[in-house]
Amino acid sequence: MHTPIGVKPVAGSKEWREAWQKRAFAHISNGYKHIYIAINSPEIFLLVCFLIRI
């Protein structure tokens, strides 16, 4: 049973869980992208470390 277009899936339903997992996955992969960029550019990595220490 698919949720009709324009209707938000009910929290706890299969569609809602799938949508939440997709959002969570997109958020996590976006975080990894930032880490990957930081590792590949030492200046940014050092700047982030410096800002965290403050």
UniProtKB/Swiss-Prot annotation:
Family: Belongs to the YojO family.
Protein's name according to its UniProt entry: Uncharacterized protein YojO
